[in-house]
Amino acid sequence: MLTNPSQLILKNSDLFTSQNVLVLNCEGDLLPKQLLESASCVTTLSLDFHHHLVMSQHSSPNLTLHFGHQLPNADQTFDSVIIYYPKAKALAGYLLNLAGQHLKAEGELIVVGENKGGVKSIVKQIPDYFDTPFKRDNARHCLLFTSQLTQKAPSIKLSDWVNSYQLDTPQGELTICNLVGVFSEKRLDEGTKLLLSHLPRLSRRVLDFGCGAGVIAAALLKAQPELEIECVDINAMALKSCELTLEANNFTAKVYASDGLSQTQGHFDDIISNPPFHDGLKSTTDIAKSFVKESAQKLKSGGGWHIVANRHLPYSDTINEFFGQVNVLAENNKYKIYSNKINQK
């Protein structure tokens, strides 16, 4: 099943006849594979690891799949580049720069997105190395714009797209590096502050789930540099931000993509997280429950599980099911800190 933006791209597949096409910020469907009915070759760059996994079993000589913040070959060029307009508007500028770097001279840019997602902003955001975007199609509550590369685009520099700032935490001052598209308040958010203020001393091998820009991992290493921390996230920009944060503070940790806990290996002494499950929707709540279950399976006997969650979210029954009891370490009018031991009676 194709998303609405993907259906609009497929409707305009004549744009890609016999072309070498790059798709940036792919959605979680099989549009890249279906594009091969008109295009000669398709390359994808997914920023969401789950979306990458959806396509991963369909790779072929003419369908090359990548996950990350950039392509491995910075000099590779394409006849056309498709951008799925991102939810974070600031990320659009980065993707446009990336598209310009990888387009051949006079190559075509296609930008697609939902009306309510801000895709109309592309007209104002387009860099001067592209011509004025043309609204080619409008269907399924989506818009599709085309533009042409009119002059050589600058090579992308991460330093142009990262925001570095000092952050005070209960463990001390840290330098945080945020790439565009990664959540940041430029201050310690209330939930993370409550979590870091009430943490027990952790044991050797620690998993930071949904690491984001690496605030929690860096704070832990500031207090306990002996920890062996693994940082996982589903978002490529977050993972690179985390790497930059660790480097800026002279810390070392293993940083990698994982869909849930599926890509983690072995068992952990502690799992810590400010998980990105805040809206209370059933689909999100189901993911949160899966996280509790997977955590219990990934902890060593006696291992600790420490998370902060919006106090209205229904964690308690699931925690009790898999950990045997519910231990609220601290709470305020917005958040609860759950701190549980596996096999704890």
Swiss-Prot record:
Q: Which PANTHER family match?
A: RIBOSOMAL RNA SMALL SUBUNIT METHYLTRANSFERASE C (PTHR47816:SF4)
Q: Give the record's subunit note.
A: Monomer.
Q: Keywords on this record?
A: Cytoplasm, Methyltransferase, rRNA processing, S-adenosyl-L-methionine, Transferase
Any coiled-coil ranges, and where?
none
Per the record's keyword annotation, is Methyltransferase included, yes or no? yes
Q: What is the annotated role of this protein in its UniProt record?
A: Specifically methylates the guanine in position 1207 of 16S rRNA in the 30S particle.
GO MF assignments: 16S rRNA (guanine(1207)-N(2))-methyltransferase activity; nucleic acid binding
CDD domains in UniProt: AdoMet_MTases
Q: Which reaction does it catalyse?
A: guanosine(1207) in 16S rRNA + S-adenosyl-L-methionine = N(2)-methylguanosine(1207) in 16S rRNA + S-adenosyl-L-homocysteine + H(+)
EC assignment: 2.1.1.172
Principal localization reads cytoplasm
Q: What is this protein called?
A: Ribosomal RNA small subunit methyltransferase C
Q: Which family does it belong to?
A: Belongs to the methyltransferase superfamily. RsmC family.
- UniProt subcellular location: Cytoplasm
Look up keyword Membrane and say if it applies.
no
Which InterPro entries does the record match to this protein? DNA_methylase_N6_adenine_CS, Mtase_sm_N, rRNA_ssu_MeTfrase_C, RsmC/RlmG, SAM-dependent_MTases_sf, Small_mtfrase_dom
Any one cellular component term from GO for this entry? cytoplasm
Organism classification: Bacteria, Pseudomonadati, Pseudomonadota, Gammaproteobacteria, Alteromonadales
Q: Which domain of life is it from?
A: Bacteria
